[in-house]
């Protein structure tokens, strides 16, 4: 389970922006205003890998960062295969405007690289080219999320804010983007490639961060089938504030924290359009459903147990 109530600052002072705009206006309005302003302030940019997802992801370029905008919902299937579930579900997220993901345009090798084994147990450490954040392979308890059965068949699950994210490399994206471009970018700015080099050769001599220099002395990370799966920390310079990379996009829980549901296995997940979903899970062989619709303003949920009993809840997102 993750607590994602985090603050993101690009080249705006977000706290000052919130004060000027009026906190009572709510996150949705603030993001709408910010997105409008930032769209005019910064041009659309090209960054290898992202173009394959141009219908759902936009990349802008500021003075210091590539700014990645998405709604946090991937086009691929989700949730199926999870065996350790906190009863969180994927919902749309406000990753736009001043809340977009920030990738440094010019990454710099750090004099003191930091390992993800004892840093960055909160928040994202990378962003995939489909606009989905990637968290530390270790969850916030320090356990390997994959080995704990917390991840779906695509390497992701949902956090405290019902936000979908990966904890291992989304190597399945290579079937979309190919092997010659990154599948993700670490938040220090260095690219993350798949399990082979761009020329198809075997990856060798990775450092403890899952990266190495190429023949042109350019640094990059690689995905691996074993820990750390993705960048195992940062070879590049980053700022760490309260256990996470800064800047960091903001998500906010809209309902009470889910509890572990012992014996639950997620067996199905379907969607109708962009905002209506049906999650199927079994407990002791009995089928249950969570049917819901989610926008940035409201989430409406129906919990249907194996006997057909239904409980409905509606949450406002502020």
Residue ranges and their predicted role:
Residues 40-141:
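Solvent-exposed N-terminal domain segments of exported/luminal and surface proteins
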Residues 89, 149-156, 205-211:
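Short, recurring structural edge motifs at helix starts
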Residues 96, 147-149, 159, 214, ...:
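Surface-exposed coil/turn segments at beta-strand junctions on protein surfaces, enriched
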Residues 113-180:
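Extracellular-facing segments of soluble proteins and assemblies that are Gly/Ser/Thr-biased and enriched
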Residues 162-284:
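Domain-length functional cores that host ligand/cofactor binding and catalytic or interaction surfaces
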